[in-house]
Amino acid sequence: MKTSLFKSLYFQVLTAIAIGILLGHYYPELGAQMKPLGDAFVKLIKMIIAPVIFCTVVTGIAGMESMKAVGRTGAVALLYFEIVSTIALIIGLIIVNVVQPGAGMNVDPATLDAQAVAVYAAQAKEQGIIAFLMDVIPGSVIGAFASGNILQVLLFAVLFGFALHRLGSKGQLIFNVIESFSQVIFGIINMIMRLAPIGAFGAMAFTIGKYGVGSLVQLGQLIICFYITCILFVVVVLGTIARVTGFSIFKFIRYIREELLIVLGTSSSESALPRMLDKMEKLGCRKSVVGLVIPTGYSFNLDGTSIYLTMAAVFIAQATNSHMDIFHQITLLVVLLLSSKGVAGVTGSGFIVLAATISAVGHLPVAGLALILGIDRFMSEARALTNLVGNGVATVVVAKWVKELDHQKLDDVLNNRAPDGKTHEISSYSRHLCP
C-alpha cells in the first residue's frame, strides 16, 4: 500500500510542491534559480498539445455518423460557455463589492510605478474582437503547429476531420495512421508526466523564492477573497451543474486530482490539457465531444479567469478611490464578456486581458495594475485550478446534452467500480469511419 502511494503521481507532485515551498522560503536565491525546471516541463507539455488536439479532433469527427452532430456539439458548447462564464463574472463582481478588499488603502495612482505594467499595457492594445477572430485563422498549417496556437490547430483539425469523413472508405488508411499516431503521442505524454514532480518543484520554488511569502501579507485580503470565491464557485455553481447532470463534483475532483496538482505546481491549466483529453474520454464522453469542448474551452470557458478579472478591476477602483457606480460596473461587465473570450490558458494571459479591459473602460487608472502585479502570480493557481475543473464539468455537461455520454461508464469510473487504465485507449466511437 505504501509502495503504491509513493509511486503515485499524486503523492510525488504534492511532495515536490511542499519541498519547493520550503526551498523558496528558506533559500530564496536558490529557489529563484529553479525556474528553468518549471519552464522546461511546461515547454514539454506545449510541445505535445498541438498533435494531441489534432489527432483527437480528427479521429473524433471522422468517426461520427453525422456531421450535424458536430455542429450541434459546437453550438451547445458555446452556449454553455457563455452562460457559465457570465455567471462567474457576476459572482466575482458581487463578492468584491460586498467584501471590498481594496477599501481604505487610499493609494494615489500617481505614486505607482507605471513602467512595471508598461509591457502588459502594450500587449493589451493588441487585444480586440477583430484581431482575435483573424488570429484564429492560421497563416499556414505549419505555422499553427509551430506556434502551438490552440484555436488555429483546432480549426485545421475540424476542417481535416470533415474532409476525411467525406472521403468515406477511401480515407480509412489515413484514419488508421492518425489513430495509431494518437497512441504514440499519448505514450509520449505518459513519459513526460513522469517529470511532473520536477516541474512542479521548480515552478513553486521559483514563485516563493522570487516573490516571497511576505508579499502575500499586504494584499492578503484580495487573495483570500479570490480563493474563497473560486472555491464557492466550484462547490456551489459547478457543483449544482454537476448534480443536475448526474454526478458529484467532489468525486469528479478526486478523479482529476493528479491533473489538479500538476496545474497547482505550474500555475497553468494548459499543462494538464493532454491528460484531460484522455481522462474525459475514459470518463464516458465521446471522443468528438472531448476534442471540441476541451480545446475550445481554453479560450471561451475560463471561469477562474472571469472571476479574477471582475474582482481585480473593482479592487483597483477601491484601492485608488476611483468611484464606480452601477453604470460603470455594468460597462465593465459587458467589456469583460467580450475581452475574456480571448484568454488562453497560460500563465500571465489573464493579466494582459485585465490591462486591456481597464484601458477599454477608461474610468480606471492603468497604473493601478502595479498594485496586483506582485501578487498576480499567487492568484494564478486558483485561476488555473478553477479553469481546469470548469472545462472538465463542461465536457460532461455538453456530452450529456448532445446524448454522447456513457452514463454507466461515468458512474462506474467516479465510484471506482471500473479500473481506469494507465494507457490511452482509442474510443470505440472513432473506429467506424462512415462511407
Swiss-Prot record:
<feature type="transmembrane region" description="Helical">
    <location>
        <begin position="142"/>
        <end position="162"/>
    </location>
</feature>
<dbReference type="GO" id="GO:0015138">
    <property type="term" value="F:fumarate transmembrane transporter activity"/>
</dbReference>
<feature type="transmembrane region" description="Helical">
    <location>
        <begin position="76"/>
        <end position="96"/>
    </location>
</feature>
<dbReference type="GO" id="GO:0015366">
    <property type="term" value="F:malate:proton symporter activity"/>
</dbReference>
<feature type="transmembrane region" description="Helical">
    <location>
        <begin position="222"/>
        <end position="242"/>
    </location>
</feature>
<keyword id="KW-0997">Cell inner membrane</keyword>
<feature type="transmembrane region" description="Helical">
    <location>
        <begin position="4"/>
        <end position="24"/>
    </location>
</feature>
<feature type="transmembrane region" description="Helical">
    <location>
        <begin position="352"/>
        <end position="372"/>
    </location>
</feature>
<keyword id="KW-0812">Transmembrane</keyword>
<feature type="transmembrane region" description="Helical">
    <location>
        <begin position="184"/>
        <end position="204"/>
    </location>
</feature>
<comment type="similarity">
    <text>Belongs to the dicarboxylate/amino acid:cation symporter (DAACS) (TC 2.A.23) family.</text>
</comment>
<feature type="transmembrane region" description="Helical">
    <location>
        <begin position="326"/>
        <end position="346"/>
    </location>
</feature>
<dbReference type="InterPro" id="IPR036458">
    <property type="entry name" value="Na:dicarbo_symporter_sf"/>
</dbReference>
<dbReference type="InterPro" id="IPR018107">
    <property type="entry name" value="Na-dicarboxylate_symporter_CS"/>
</dbReference>
<feature type="transmembrane region" description="Helical">
    <location>
        <begin position="44"/>
        <end position="64"/>
    </location>
</feature>
<comment type="function">
    <text>Responsible for the transport of dicarboxylates such as succinate, fumarate, and malate from the periplasm across the membrane.</text>
</comment>
<dbReference type="Pfam" id="PF00375">
    <property type="entry name" value="SDF"/>
</dbReference>
<keyword id="KW-0472">Membrane</keyword>
<protein>
    <recommendedName>
        <fullName>C4-dicarboxylate transport protein</fullName>
    </recommendedName>
</protein>
<keyword id="KW-1133">Transmembrane helix</keyword>
<dbReference type="GO" id="GO:0070778">
    <property type="term" value="P:L-aspartate transmembrane transport"/>
</dbReference>
<dbReference type="InterPro" id="IPR001991">
    <property type="entry name" value="Na-dicarboxylate_symporter"/>
</dbReference>
<dbReference type="GO" id="GO:0005886">
    <property type="term" value="C:plasma membrane"/>
</dbReference>
<dbReference type="GO" id="GO:0015141">
    <property type="term" value="F:succinate transmembrane transporter activity"/>
</dbReference>
<keyword id="KW-0813">Transport</keyword>
<feature type="transmembrane region" description="Helical">
    <location>
        <begin position="289"/>
        <end position="309"/>
    </location>
</feature>
<dbReference type="InterPro" id="IPR023954">
    <property type="entry name" value="C4_dicarb_transport"/>
</dbReference>
<keyword id="KW-1003">Cell membrane</keyword>
<keyword id="KW-0769">Symport</keyword>
